[in-house]
């Protein structure tokens, strides 16, 4: 899914200026990367707030329109208000199509309900890490990674090497020879 966001350069900075922006339905943000100086921007709160609720937005390649120019960006960070449903600030990183990007991708458990551990041993699969840091070209960044648990039994520990990575995607930890545990399987051993 592709996302398009309109942004404008903001001149006024600081706490007071940021509060005024938020009252006007805007979010203060920053755009950095691509060897350029960071640019203070403002984006529409409603557009970003509802997009952030979608898991795919966090790893998607976003088209950011700024001063009539469109840039490919990814969400690098964002801050939420402690108790209101409100985005306080957002950081975008400009990316080039031919340069690798390091990003955290969500991890999903699949086929756990069909495994011996769950069906016969009354167990369950628990994630130790909800996301995996990967290295990929912007066009190859997956929305999520699947951890297939069809063959697991109680007592198993699943590692990064058990995740099938799509073509053109590498695990940062596996490149450093760190095969970290990502999930455990609990239940009665038979």
From Swiss-Prot:
One of its GO terms (cellular component) is cytosolic large ribosomal subunit. Signal peptide: none annotated. The keyword Ribonucleoprotein applies. It holds the Pfam family Ribosomal_TL5_C. InterPro entries: Rbsml_bL25/Gln-tRNA_synth_N, Ribosomal_bL25/Gln-tRNA_synth, Ribosomal_bL25_b-dom, Ribosomal_bL25_C, Ribosomal_bL25_long, Ribosomal_bL25_short, Ribosomal_L25_dom, Ribosomal_uL5_bac-type. GO terms for biological process: translation. One of its GO terms (molecular function) is structural constituent of ribosome. Keywords: Ribonucleoprotein, Ribosomal protein, RNA-binding, rRNA-binding. Part of the 50S ribosomal subunit; part of the 5S rRNA/L5/L18/L25 subcomplex. Contacts the 5S rRNA. Binds to the 5S rRNA independently of L5 and L18. PANTHER family: RIBOSOMAL PROTEIN L25/GLN-TRNA SYNTHETASE, ANTI-CODON-BINDING DOMAIN-CONTAINING PROTEIN, RIBOSOMAL PROTEIN L25_GLN-TRNA SYNTHETASE, ANTI-CODON-BINDING DOMAIN-CONTAINING PROTEIN. Belongs to the bacterial ribosomal protein bL25 family. CTC subfamily. This is Large ribosomal subunit protein bL25.
């Amino acid at each position: 899914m592709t996302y398009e966001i309109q942004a404008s350069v903001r001149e006024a900075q600081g706490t007071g200026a940021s509060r005024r922006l938020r009252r006007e339905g805007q979010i203060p943000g920053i755009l950095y990367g691509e060897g350029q100086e960071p640019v203070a921007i403002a984006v529409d709160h409603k557009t970003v707030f509802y997009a952030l609720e979608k898991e795919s937005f966090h790893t998607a390649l976003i088209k950011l329109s700024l001063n009539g120019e469109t840039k490919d960006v990814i969400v690098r960070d964002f801050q939420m208000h402690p108790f209101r449903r409100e985005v306080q600030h957002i950081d975008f990183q400009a990316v080039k199509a031919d340069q690798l990007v390091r990003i955290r991708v969500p991890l999903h458990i699949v086929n756990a309900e069909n495994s011996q551990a769950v069906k016969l041993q009354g167990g369950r699969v628990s994630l130790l890490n909800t996301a995996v840091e990967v290295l990929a070209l912007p066009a190859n960044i997956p929305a999520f990674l699947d951890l297939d648990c069809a063959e697991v039994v109680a007592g198993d520990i699943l590692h990064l090497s058990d995740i099938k990575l799509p073509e053109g995607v590498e695990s940062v930890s596996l490149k450093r020879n760190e095969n970290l545990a990502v999930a455990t399987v609990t239940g009665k051993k038979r």
